[in-house]
């Protein structure tokens, strides 16, 4: 007699920079509902959070996030003009020393990350080798982080080709795919900031001022008689938002997940890494909203 096999649940964590801290809340809420994925894959920030989960370090990682301030964020920015504004070595060495320092094959559950080959535009699935190096390649957002040389190829952020890696989760053996899309409501977010009622704190303003000053130093100063345009930083982040939304919609239309969890994160910017608590709470709320679909597809574990 053939005994039916339990369906394998895969978790596909999308990219979205600082909004990716919402993935922590999503995972916590899934487990509280008795839904435990059998495998996890991620793009960009999703690759980072997914690795922490696959390594069994999510609780430690979450505690660090909740203590993360703007000063800490700025300390990780090793500014460089060789391939990107940020070299990325400080950040990766921090994670190597404090969280994840083992091969992908030795993680507690199957894990993979998505990157993009810079010279060909090919989608690259990183399913073996160093976990930290896979993360570094997947988060290499063009112009912000320098590319990574991996096995003779320059790799950049996987969000350029597959922002929510449903296809990778299927290839890893998932029968049911839960996709977490961080970009459902973010188009135009940065360009709306000037009309927002909430005034940024002095600390936040100083953080954004420093980064904008560094970027602005690379470009000619706008003349007083020219029309006021968005800052370089706003244009870049808004362009990234548009790209991720359009690619995500296209990919998921052709490769639909079984359940989509879509946290509402328009109030968080790409670089708001110090606002982890808000992102995590929104991730939890998004799971609550999707519970009927989740329960229909995924039989909760006792």
Annotate each language-model stretch with its function.
Residues 1-43, 51-302:
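Patatin-like phospholipase
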């Amino acid at each position: 007699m053939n005994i039916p096999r339990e369906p394998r649940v895969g978790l596909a964590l999308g990219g979205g920079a600082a909004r990716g801290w919402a993935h922590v809340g999503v995972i916590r809420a899934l487990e509280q509902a008795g839904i435990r994925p059998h495998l996890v894959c991620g793009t960009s920030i999703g690759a980072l959070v997914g690795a922490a989960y696959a390594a069994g370090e999510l609780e430690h990682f979450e505690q660090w996030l909740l203590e993360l301030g703007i000063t800490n964020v700025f300390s990780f920015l090793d500014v460089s003009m060789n391939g990107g504004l940020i070299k990325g070595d400080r950040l990766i060495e921090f994670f190597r020393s404090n969280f994840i320092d083992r091969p992908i094959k030795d993680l507690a559950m199957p894990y993979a990350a998505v990157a993009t080959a810079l010279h060909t535009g090919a989608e690259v699935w990183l399913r073996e080798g160093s976990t930290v190096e896979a993360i570094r390649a997947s988060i290499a957002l063009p112009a912000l982080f320098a590319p990574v040389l991996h096995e003779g190829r320059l790799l950049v952020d996987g969000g350029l080709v597959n922002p929510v890696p449903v296809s990778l989760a299927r290839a890893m053996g998932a029968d049911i795919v839960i996709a977490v899309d961080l970009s459902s409501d973010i188009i135009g977010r940065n360009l709306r900031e000037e009309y927002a009622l909430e005034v940024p704190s002095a600390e936040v303003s100083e953080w954004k001022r420093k980064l904008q000053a560094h970027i602005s130093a690379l470009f000619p100063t706008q003349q007083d008689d020219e029309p006021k345009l968005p800052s370089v930083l706003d244009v870049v982040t808004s362009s990234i938002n548009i790209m991720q939304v359009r690619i995500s919609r296209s990919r998921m239309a052709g490769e639909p997940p079984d359940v989509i969890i879509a946290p509402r994160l328009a109030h968080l910017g790409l670089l708001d890494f110090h606002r982890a608590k808000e992102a995590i709470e929104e991730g939890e709320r998004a799971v609550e909203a999707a519970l009927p679909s989740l329960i229909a597809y995924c039989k909760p574990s006792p």
